[in-house]
């Protein structure tokens, strides 16, 4: 297996792999161990994904490395894991945007030092003014004295 295939298997639980295999096998009508790219969309929808036509074409182009017009189970796993990770990344970014808006009290699109201090104090941990300044300086990449949304995302990525 390729590195991507090994990574895909380690990302998924045994139950998920079994569930994906069951869906995959339903469409592998001749038992040859692969499905046609046409059937891919149907399988993905069964597993709760909802790819657009364009997304499907892009996925197929990426996954069908040998250009055979079919996808084997290992290629399929790699693709499903990519989709799941993209879904998760999209969700967490939305949640972070929501969080950002809550702390951007005056709605100016920035979190200033005062708002930033409130965030840190709201965690319940005691925080000194120096620590607030230090963290603020770390996050404020363009040194304008405030944290914009991109800087906020970067800070949150480093925490996770």
UniProtKB/Swiss-Prot annotation:
List positions binding Ca(2+) 1.
Answer: 28, 30, 34, 39
Q: GO molecular-function annotation terms? A: calcium ion binding
CDD domains xrefs: EFh
- Return the protein name: Troponin C, skeletal muscle
Annotated InterPro entries: CALM/Myosin/TropC-like, EF-hand-dom_pair, EF_Hand_1_Ca_BS, EF_hand_dom
- Does the keyword section mention Iron? no
| Residues the record lists as binding Ca(2+) 3 | 104, 106, 108, 115
Known function: Troponin is the central regulatory protein of striated muscle contraction. Tn consists of three components: Tn-I which is the inhibitor of actomyosin ATPase, Tn-T which contains the binding EF-hand for tropomyosin and Tn-C. The binding of calcium to Tn-C abolishes the inhibitory action of Tn on actin filaments.
Q: Name one GO cellular component term.
A: myosin II complex
Q: Where does Ca(2+) 2 bind?
A: 64, 66, 68, 70, 75
Q: Describe the location of the EF-hand domain by residue ranges.
A: 15-50, 51-86, 91-126, 127-160
**Matching SUPFAM superfamilies, A to Z?**
EF-hand (SSF47473)
